[in-house]
Amino acid sequence: MYPCILHKKCYNITKADAIPENRLIFKGRQTDKAIAKEHYSMRALNLTLLTDLYELTMMQGYFKNPTDQVVVFDAFYRKNPCDGGYAIAAGLEQIIEYIRDLHFTPDDIDYLKSLKIFDADFLEYLRGFHFTGDIYAIPEGTVIFPREPLVKVIAPVMEAQLIETALLNILNHQSLIATKASRVVYAAKGDGIMEFGLRRAQGPDAGIYGARAAMIGGCIGTSNVLTGQMFDVPVKGTHAHS
């Protein structure tokens, strides 16, 4: 199931095969459009190896010493950005896509084999790997504070170990951008704020998902045409200044 527990401000996004079409929440308004057109989705890019090497070597250690232990990990932050009083949660939708498509391709296995640090039986285990745990998360756009759980992972230890890096990468970046956007929108006192950050973003992925996060933070539009197409958000522009 995929219960939306709004009064608890928590989503259960587990059981990857049971997750329905993703939805966006902008300024409290939920849209019926899918998170992205299928051929533009990040699902087209397998992100399973978006992890630190030590996560995989630790997984092999657990594999060599079998355990059925289920662990609980909470993702939280210690200090508000820019010494502000709050932050804004963002990144959940990409986390959902990442979990849904979590698997090792033959190319992934071949690459890991080439590193010559993983045993054949462990690599064979990875061929059939999929996430079976539970994930609970605060909805995007929610005001959040230090040291409160934003995402809770309940899963077998190897599965929880693997997803740590990507989960934090997605959550931290997009929540930071959404928070900054929210502070700018608040300072504007009702004037509309547009997001024009693409040319200064740290690469295409940061530009695309940063623009989406800025919309969650309250911006009324973005200059990023690809973000507009992917997520059906307003695109806006002025003219050259040179």
Q: Where are these predicted regions, by residue range?
A:
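Ordered alpha/beta subdomains of enzyme catalytic regions
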Residues: 26, 32-242
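Short, positively charged and aromatic/hydrophobic N-terminal segments
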Residues: 2-7, 11-12, 18-21, 25-27, ...
